[in-house]
Amino acid sequence: MKTTPRILEVRTRILKKNDEIARGMRRDFEQFGLLVVNMVSSPGTGKTAFLKETLTRLAACGEPSAAVVGDLETDNDARRLAESGVPVRQINTHGLCHLEAEMVAEHLAGWNLAGLRYLFIENVGNLVCPTSWDLGESLRVALLSVTEGEDKPLKYPGLFNTADLAVI
């Protein structure tokens, strides 16, 4: 008698712990009335310049804002954003290509989130890895520059399918 092989699919969410932390953060953010924006783009697209201008304008309008910056190494971008006058914290991933909810949660410790209206997360410059990691954000924004080519949404559907907004 010939038997047909059976395939048993077991799907375990690899990112389960991250998702649990992100859900808790999202609940906290919502309780505080805090809008959290996760900015995702390629390296060199202009995330930092775009965010610095945004933070500067929000500060000028009296809107309490802050930023968390993810980068492999250095605090260059965090120092640039701090020029806007808002609180900024740096997360160095030391080679990791994305931020994780736990990293963000640790770097938010001690901040009066209830006193903020906007929190921006400048994710590590990468169009692939950050897509899978929920950071508890209200909005995910994909930022791309014209010089990167018009086919980015086709090459990186994961990001553009999960983004709430794309800025060119």
Segment roles from a protein language model:
Residues 4-27, 31-34, 54-138, 148-151, ...:
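Nucleotide-state-sensitive switch-loop elements of NTP-binding domains
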Residues 39:
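Hydrophobic anchor at the beta1->P-loop junction of P-loop NTPases
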Residues 47:
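Conserved lysine of the Walker
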Residues 66, 141-143, 160-168:
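Conserved beta-strand/loop subsegment of P-loop NTPase cores
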Residues 156:
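Acidic, amphipathic alpha-helical patches
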